[in-house]
């Protein structure tokens, strides 16, 4: 994801397994899976539009965890209160540091987002069973806004007045970082001249 005014990029589709795994458990239809996937993308993209996680020393898998939680909650049919608690549980327990993607990269780089998905589904399951989370996790004096991002509003979500962010999806031509796409195209063109 690289929205037109995004402060962070990343892969919102990393959150799709939350809808798939919960759908199997809950025995829901493909419609619910698609809805959960769109919700995951929308939440991730809205966070990426507002929070430059990398600049603050954190990893984008925080957004994957929160997006996965929202997706799982929707597919599981959780109430608004249960969903709020699930999001609080995930956010309180899944603050991933940015070092997982920089320097000498370990195997954990490939697991950070998957761990966020797992934690999102687990938090939704806990909330469904009545577990509560710190509901002031975003705006409390020691919360997300204070410690990570500064205050922000997510803005209007996709629907009647605003297009869904998933409609801005793009595909990479090559399995390399987005900033290397044009360089690789040039290399392939030059290769035939050598």
Protein language model annotation of sequence segments:
Residues 2, 46-56, 96-104:
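Glycine- and aromatic-rich loop/turn segments at beta-sheet edges
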Residues 1-46:
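Hydrophobic alpha-helical hairpins/lids featuring a short glycine-rich hinge
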Residues 6-13, 33-37, 53-65, 109-115, ...:
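Active-site nucleophile and cofactor-binding loops and adjacent substrate-binding regions
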